A protein has these predicted regions:
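Conserved alpha-helical scaffold segments that buttress catalytic/binding sites
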Residues: 2-316
Length: 316
């Protein structure tokens, strides 16, 4: 990672582990394994995809919102800093992210990448592929997103990462095992639905992911994770309703309620198969009262604390 971890700030209630918050816990136990944050401040893919820029400020906004969250006395959390992102050099930035992810996996940590646009996902995947953790194992990619992000384009964008991952899986002779929760029908063309079907992608529409469907959503996740050996979770904040997440590159017209998304995060965070997560598309320029940053922080916190309740190394 090219830049060291920024200074964290937040509320302080007193000394001692019973008063721990993220800002005081970060990098407190450098030798211990735990959850390790990596910032990827890029909106290059969003701009290439015709979206509204601003997601490069996402990592800082998530850290700021996370700083005062209370944390369990025994939880181990690290901040590995930000990957360098320069100009329009997306591919070089993704390569840098891959190196950072592979390094954290090699150290026995659970990397959690803070985006950045959803072009983050391909860099995350490359790091997992380089780590050796996929050797002889079946990878499952679970995406919480209003979009399939399976576009075919001349160059990488925020709309192409899972098409690129499909190619990467084919290259290593593996099946592309990909599921999306929260697909918005009006936001995906018939061609994208056809591509998803051809690639064997499982999905749930946003219409079928409302509060009353939470048990069905949980069952969908359980069925998906049962079929894989290693799990990678990617969250695009545009999966949430625009009222709960206005500060994203492409706000949702319906969305999956935060309560349902949190249930998925708890379930996946508790799964020993989870080895990598990222959260993307926070665009602070369009946020209202830090609403989106705070819900993003809550999702990161939920997964990190769920993972802390088990051994991060279990199941590797």
């Amino acid at each position: 990672v090219s830049t060291s971890a920024p200074e964290w700030t937040g509320r302080t209630d007193g000394p001692g582990p019973e008063h721990r918050r993220w800002h005081s816990a970060i990098n407190e136990s450098p030798g211990a394994t735990g959850v390790s944050l990596i910032g990827f401040p890029s909106d290059i893919g969003v701009r290439r995809n015709g979206g509204r820029p601003g997601a490069q400020a996402g990592p800082g906004a998530i850290r700021a919102a996370l700083g005062s969250f209370a944390i369990q006395p025994e939880s181990v959390v690290h901040d590995a800093g930000d990957v360098a992102v320069s100009g329009d050099a997306l591919e070089a930035a993704q390569d840098g992210l891959a190196e950072a992810v592979a390094a954290q996996l090699g150290a026995g940590n659970l990397p959690f990448v803070l985006g950045g646009g959803h072009e983050t996902a391909y860099g995350s995947y490359l790091g997992l592929a380089r780590s050796g953790l996929l050797d002889g194992r079946r990878l499952g990619v679970l995406n919480l997103d209003a979009h399939f992000d399976l576009r075919q384009a001349d160059r990488a964008t925020s709309g192409t990462p899972f098409r690129q991952i499909a190619a990467g899986e084919a290259e290593r002779g593996a099946d592309f095992t990909y599921a999306v929760i929260g697909i918005s029908q009006p936001s995906n063309t018939a061609a994208l639905f056809t591509t998803a079907a051809e690639l064997g992608v499982r999905h749930l529409l946003d219409l079928d992911c409302q509060e009353r469907h939470v048990e069905d959503v949980v069952e969908f996740v359980r069925a998906f994770t049962a079929d894989v050996d290693v799990l990678y979770l990617s969250i695009d904040l545009d999966v949430l309703p625009a009222a709960q997440a206005p500060g994203v590159s492409a706000p949702s017209t319906l969305g999956v309620p935060a309560g349902v998304v949190i249930e998925v995060c708890r379930l996946v965070g508790n799964d020993p198969k989870l080895v990598l997560a990222d959260i993307t598309e926070l665009n602070p320029t369009y946020d209202i009262d830090n609403r989106t940053a705070r819900v993003a922080a809550r999702l990161v916190h939920t997964i990190a604390m769920s993972a802390a309740d088990r051994s991060v190394l279990e199941g590797r």
